[in-house]
């Protein structure tokens, strides 16, 4: 076999022509200190704030402190495998999470990785967890109601689509139950719900997921969980991951409800990170930007203008108080950012008033704009009646003789409190709420004994299902009250069949 020189030279020429020099440039630094979930690295001079970096063992980190001669990095995972002298390299990516329809019905961590054992999440789209809130001209005022199915909220402190309503109270006052009931009530309402559990026990999150599954609510819900055993950076990132997943749907013109349970734990995690990064502490040892931590999160809730698709993102942030002190640092911060608050009181909870909503301290700064016409008409005086009752109740304890008008107010108040009580995980459609509150405010319950009011309500709903469908349908379709004579006749007809307990 002879070697032909021209063939060899042709091959060499071809290889020279096709040669591509692919030089990969990457910024690499060195870990100079590591511990408590924080690493300091030298040599990453061009890293961006919030950029993802990768350690030699594959664990990711996020650059938070950009100092003169080193970078403070929070480690998003176990830090025991990282040691001094290890290599750390830039990725050029800002922290982002997977988004899309594939996440619905799944339980994921703040990095978007599934933790429910149902295999990988099949989605290719991502969104950065930090993104600017919609501008002034991109928004529209809140005008559509978000029905929670809880009488005390829908009547006294209504929530609208695109609103931010704080739920505040001590531990064990039913905050999570309010959120779960609201999510369950969004069935058939064309709503995507996102439940963000921050620093909760894993057993608690499991219970919530099972409750949602049992009521068929997991079909439109994403659960994001950063449990108490996770590193502080994941607790800090969880709410931003949740809102990024929600924004994907909002900008597509859909309606989203995001529950943050709870922001006190996120604030504590952020305080921990800030102190470990040696940022100067302020009041209660929180860093100076703790207000911005929550404001930039909650400002991303909005009702978009029609030009932007008309989608909405409603936020229900939770804050846990200590011994009912709503004037502490984090509660006052979040109250000033949100459009109202629902204050749950432990005294009411333990006295059997559940949901334990304090009508005096709870407000909705959107108010009537987030109620249907029918509810506005019947619930107008309800808050005043309740406030007057609470005031008179204090006087009545002294046992002095009361005039007829005061006795009537006390009797009406006691029945109002009974009507506003509600069992767990049993949200009530708004049309039925309107009719029972109409019966209450128009005096139809005044001659029913207080202990029979709950039974009256239950039997009234059953009676309406059989004999009052036309009234319910009227409220459902027109959002207004039916003819008052028809209503009065229907309630009187039911009262004749109702048997008072002896």
Swiss-Prot record:
Family annotation (Gene3D superfamilies): 2.40.30.20, ATP synthase alpha/beta chain, C-terminal domain, P-loop containing nucleotide triphosphate hydrolases
Protein EC: 7.1.2.2
Superkingdom to which the source organism belongs: Bacteria
A UniProt-annotated Pfam family: ATP-synt_ab
Annotated GO CC locations: plasma membrane; proton-transporting ATP synthase complex
Positions that bind ATP: 169-176
UniProt-annotated stretches for the region Disordered: 115-137
Catalyzed reactions per annotation: ATP + H2O + 4 H(+)(in) = ADP + phosphate + 5 H(+)(out)
Enzyme class: translocase
Cell location: Cell membrane
Alphabetized UniProt keyword annotations: ATP synthesis, ATP-binding, Cell membrane, CF(1), Hydrogen ion transport, Ion transport, Membrane, Nucleotide-binding, Translocase, Transport
Cystine crosslinks: none
Record site: Required for activity: 362
Family: Belongs to the ATPase alpha/beta chains family.
Protein name per the record: ATP synthase subunit alpha
Native species: Geobacillus kaustophilus (strain HTA426)
Lineage summary: Bacteria, Bacillati, Bacillota, Bacilli, Bacillales
């Amino acid at each position: 076999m002879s070697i032909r020189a021209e063939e060899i030279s042709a091959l060499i020429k071809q290889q020279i022509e096709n040669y591509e020099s692919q030089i990969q440039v990457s910024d690499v630094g060195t870990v100079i200190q590591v511990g408590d979930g924080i690493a300091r690295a030298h040599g990453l001079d061009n890293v961006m704030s919030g950029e993802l970096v990768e350690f030699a063992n594959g664990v990711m980190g996020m650059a938070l402190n950009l100092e003169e001669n080193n970078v403070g990095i929070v480690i998003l995972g176990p830090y025991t495998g990282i040691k001094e002298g290890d290599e750390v390299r830039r990725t050029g990516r800002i922290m982002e999470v997977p988004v899309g329809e594939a996440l619905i019905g799944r339980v994921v961590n703040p990095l978007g990785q599934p933790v429910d054992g149902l295999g990988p999440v099949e989605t290719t789209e991502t969104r950065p967890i930090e993104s600017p809130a919609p501008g002034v001209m991109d928004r529209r005022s809140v005008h559509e109601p978000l029905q929670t199915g809880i009488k005390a909220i829908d009547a006294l402190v209504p929530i609208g689509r695109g609103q931010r309503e704080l739920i505040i109270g001590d531990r064990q006052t039913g905050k999570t139950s309010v959120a779960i009931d609201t999510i369950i009530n969004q069935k058939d309402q064309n709503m995507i719900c996102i439940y963000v559990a921050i620093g909760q026990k894993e057993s608690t999150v499991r219970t919530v997921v099972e409750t949602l599954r049992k009521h068929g609510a997991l079909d439109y819900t994403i659960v994001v969980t950063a449990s108490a055993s996770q590193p502080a950076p994941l607790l800090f990132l969880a709410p931003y991951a949740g809102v990024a997943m929600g924004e994907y749907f909002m900008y597509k013109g859909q309606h989203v409800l995001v529950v943050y349970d709870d922001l006190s734990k996120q604030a504590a995690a952020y305080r921990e990170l800030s102190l470990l990064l040696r940022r100067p502490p302020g009041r209660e040892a929180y860093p100076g930007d703790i207000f911005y931590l929550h404001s930039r999160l909650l400002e991303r809730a909005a009702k978009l203008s029609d030009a932007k698709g008309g989608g909405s993102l409603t936020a229900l942030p939770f804050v846990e108080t200590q011994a009912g002190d709503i004037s502490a640092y984090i509660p006052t911060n979040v109250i000033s950012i949100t459009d109202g608050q629902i204050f749950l009181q432990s005294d009411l909870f333990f006295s059997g008033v559940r949901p334990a909503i304090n009508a005096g301290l709870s407000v909705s700064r959107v108010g009537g704009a987030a109620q249907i016409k029918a509810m506005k008409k019947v619930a107008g005086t309800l808050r005043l009646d309740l406030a007057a009752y609470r005031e008179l109740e204090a006087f009545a304890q002294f046992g002095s003789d009361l005039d007829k008008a005061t006795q009537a107010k006390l009797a009406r108040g006691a029945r109002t409190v009974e009507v506003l009580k509600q069992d767990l995980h049993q949200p009530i459609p708004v049309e039925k709420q309107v009719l029972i509150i109409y019966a209450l405010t128009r005096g139809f319950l005044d001659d029913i004994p207080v202990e029979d009011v709950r039974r009256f309500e239950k039997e009234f709903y059953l009676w309406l299902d059989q004999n009052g469908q036309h009234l319910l349908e009227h409220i459902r379709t027109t959002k207004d009250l039916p003819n008052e004579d028809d209503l009065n006749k229907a309630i009187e007809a039911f009262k004749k069949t109702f048997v008072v307990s002896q």
